[in-house]
Amino acid sequence: MRAEHSQQPEFGQRVRRRREELGFSQRRLAGDIVTASYISLLESGQRSPTLDLVLHLSEVLQMPLEELTGRDRSSAAATEPGGLDLVIARSAARGAAELGDHARAAELLAAAYTTAVERGAAALQLDLGLALQEELRAAGRQPDRLALLERLADQEWATTDPRLRVVLFTELATAQRDTGRLTDARKSAYTALGEIGPAELTGAFEHVRLLGILISVLCELNDLGQVELLLKEMLSHAEGHRPPVRGRAHWVSSIAYSQLGMGTAARHHLDLARAQLTTPDTPVRDWLRFMRSAGNVLLDDGDPGAALPWLQAAEQVGPMVDAPDETTRILALRARYELAVGAAAQVVEVYPRLSAGSAPLTGPDLVRANLVQAEALAELGRTEEAQALLRRTAALCDELTAYELAVRVWKRIDTLRS
């Protein structure tokens, strides 16, 4: 097999020199991001670093990004203390996030990011901006996260490096998906996918993750024509990765196959995902999301008995995570379960907390909750209310540009009329 040679051999040389200065082993430098063997290949110029790895190395090697990447114009510029306060703020924010205080972490990072913008420090803007968008996501501030990522993706320096474009447009796609802008999310995901080759990331973690995001967006849009092919591509690339990556690929596959009506395949991938993700390394919030997904997949397959333990586990774990949006989604799963076991009155009782509570559902989540509520109303003989809700839901689908889903909603309205 031909070795993959880096187009930036000087980067590996800088990494090796600094590592040896600090007396670090390649294993210590690798951390949990890559393997020691990968660091060896990187230092010898046979691998190119991803953006996440560059940021990791900058932190571990205690080198400014400009110096590490060779973009500084002088040694004085590389050691200028002007960004020290921002590095300290970044560290403080990391500490707050580790304690679960994502609101405080976002506050610290937002102030540091604003300062970096005022100073015109492009590398720090990128570093702090990407860190900030993660904390905004964890804090449930999706509109703020979207606005930030749109600013980052619109910067002139965001057009020059394909690896950077992969990162930015991947995150932008998730933010657009999470705020219901599904057509925009699909466009951003395809934009990022077009940069995978130039960025030399084919088959890398970033590629696997991006395919999963694209698949999820297409499923939300009910645009399923290419989903099976994309699933096969994603699973093929994921095979050579560590359990967390494989687990998430199977997780996405379980949801997608369920959407395709292939219940057996969905449950198979659900089992594979569970086997890969049942480790102490899986963040609690991710495990909570997985439990919700498992419950929904099993309800899709008409098995409320199998879904119930996952629902109950999610209800127990939910209070451990400071995430009001997740709490509402768990409640939506409860409503769906109650409908499946014939407790329509319970669904109607729960619904106001889904649509107008402290963290109401939006976008595709609200569409799904509305469909459950409409079915419950119909079962209770409140047909006119069900039809009115479905009409509002069809209009929401149009706003989300989920036109195929809107057609399905109108067909259900027609059956209620007959």
Model-predicted regions and their roles:
Residues 81-85, 120-127, 160-171, 200-213, ...:
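Alpha-solenoid helical repeat architecture
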Residues 1-21:
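A short, Lys/Arg-rich alpha-helix, primarily the initiator
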Residues 20-41:
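Short alpha-helical DNA-recognition segment
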Residues 50-67:
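DNA major-groove recognition helix of helix-turn-helix/homeodomain DNA-binding modules
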Residues 73, 110-117, 150-157, 190-200, ...:
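Amphipathic alpha-helical segments of tetratricopeptide repeats
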